[in-house]
């Protein structure tokens, strides 16, 4: 766990602090942070999602149907619970609630999935299976849903778009159609040659570092104030989602190792894609970025807890 913290979690904290202090010194402005996020959202993130999903194969997805169904139901359920809670309890707009759900209702499986699971459970087929399934659910299902929920409030004339126009608008975003296309290719059995990976990887490597740095810039542009909403987002991401995965997985008699990995994957900090989308559309940036920062620090405490609990009961 110490190796993971130093090698994977500490860099996130350091880069976010670097962005934060750069913002405080006005080396970069909040507008420049949005430009960084536009680069990530339109180019780096779609490339990263495409590469990560096409590494899977259809046999992986159907190898453990119960694992796929449990992950799908719980993650999508937590996504909508987060949206509903933010909209009803904290009186946010539909768009703000959509971004809240993308942050609090989605684990950062693409960036930290293998980094967390491999040192604990080994570089095995099972690890790849869990990461592939959850990655497809987060990137090919919840991101498109989130952008669809976000778009009705973002019409150019200030009026709500129709459901059809919102759907079309969401589908045009590279961060939506790239993972959906990758998932379709996986399901029909089309394998992208490994020799093509460098073509996508060069821009994809900019994804996480630039996104975390820009999150630090965004955090610097707003006064940090811990609130009940930030606590709610952190609780949902670090406690409620892994707890739901554990209980539903036990009820469905999942394989013990798969259950442990699924729970830990669900306990990961919020997906960076939510922060990128927040900054890109200038929606829910302050609370969303603060929720990410608190969740990253909280994960240091909750990760060992979920490892212990899932091993104890599975």
From Swiss-Prot:
Xref: InterPro entries: Mem_transp_PIN-like, Na+/solute_symporter_sf
Bilayer topology term: Multi-pass membrane protein
Pfam families xrefs: Mem_trans
Regions that span the bilayer: 4-23, 36-53, 68-90, 97-116, 131-153, 174-196, 200-222, 229-251, 261-283, 290-309
UniProt entry keywords in alphabetical sequence: Cell membrane, Membrane, Transmembrane, Transmembrane helix, Transport
One cellular component term from this protein's GO annotations in UniProt: plasma membrane
Subcellular location: Cell membrane
Transmembrane recorded as keyword: yes
The keyword Cell cycle belongs to this UniProt entry's keyword annotation: no
Gene Ontology biological-process entries: transmembrane transport
Highest rank taxon of the organism: Bacteria
Recorded family membership: Belongs to the auxin efflux carrier (TC 2.A.69) family.
Protein name from the UniProt record: Uncharacterized transporter YfdV
Gene expressing this chain: yfdV
